[in-house]
Amino acid sequence: MPRGHKSKLRTCEKRQETNGQPQGLTGPQATAEKQEESHSSSSSSRACLGDCRRSSDASIPQESQGVSPTGSPDAVVSYSKSDVAANGQDEKSPSTSRDASVPQESQGASPTGSPDAGVSGSKYDVAANGQDEKSPSTSHDVSVPQESQGASPTGSPDAGVSGSKYDVAAEGEDEESVSASQKAIIFKRLSKDAVKKKACTLAQFLQKKFEKKESILKADMLKCVRREYKPYFPQILNRTSQHLVVAFGVELKEMDSSGESYTLVSKLGLPSEGILSGDNALPKSGLLMSLLVVIFMNGNCATEEEVWEFLGLLGIYDGILHSIYGDARKIITEDLVQDKYVVYRQVCNSDPPCYEFLWGPRAYAETTKMRVLRVLADSSNTSPGLYPHLYEDALIDEVERALRLRA
């Protein structure tokens, strides 16, 4: 209460005491007089207090006052009762807390400065503390998001338990799916490895058949790959054919529509009575194909260094015996030179002497540059048109051959 209002109240009380108190009375009369005076004083003070309150309400806005809106002890009592009622509602509602409902100014000293107001505030604090202890989902950290707290987002233990059960079930399903996928991958890998091994075995079997000039039958090939791999026979046969093309320059073809008998045909179109008829025929055919390709790629003339660099990409090295070709140097510098498929000569004015390879007359007669280009394109899964310079050279070679035949 402002000082001006207090002074007016005190002035009214003193005036009533001065006007209504007779002097010189003692004993029971004085006591009775005092009771009447106190009764009249209290009624007068209440009337005066009402006047002061009305004047203060008219002159001073409630927002600027630091006291209770009513400014009277009754108002303080009513304020404390409303707090207790609000506290009861807080206990029933677990979603509120004392920090969210009580302003900081109401904690501590009473707005009116009276002991009753202070007691009412302390009672509210005690009730609020009890409510906080009873409510498991509310605390003074109401502003903290649930994600930052360790509790479940729903605020109940059952929700956390159900979530953990779901996670365990999901993990079990994931493990089962992962194990199933791993088994499928392993089975597929084993199948590929088995097909690859059986293809190599079948290629060696066909090589021996060809060298012995024996007929190649499907029944014999099925016996070679065994009965348990019969479902994979088409894949094994396809991989075997690819292996024969890369290694020996020949492809596996059916002799009739029944598909029961096969034969090996040169990929370069070389006649069977030529290089494929002598000893060590397939290794020679394979190295000849690689040698003609590298010569054509290097402008129809390749140095010995360029040839060995290309053969090194195929795992064929100078001075090292190969598991399929044996002595590769002897084949390309002696055997194929004697058969006139390649020319091996010293580079002019080279010191120390260097050597180069060219196509021989028999290679020009039995194959064409276009066939060699197609072999190169097939090995890289492309088309001859992707090598424009080589393709142009091959077309010119085709035209010249046609003109020679007409002449």
Swiss-Prot record:
Expression across tissues is: Expressed in testis. Not expressed in other normal tissues, but is expressed in tumors of different histological origins.
- A Pfam family that this protein carries is MAGE
Q: Region labeled Disordered — which residues?
A: 1-175
Bias (Polar residues): 18-29, 57-71, 94-113, 136-155
Superkingdom field: Eukaryota
**Domain MAGE residue range list:** 195-394
Q: What is this protein called?
A: Melanoma-associated antigen B6
Where does this protein come from, organism-wise? Homo sapiens (Human)
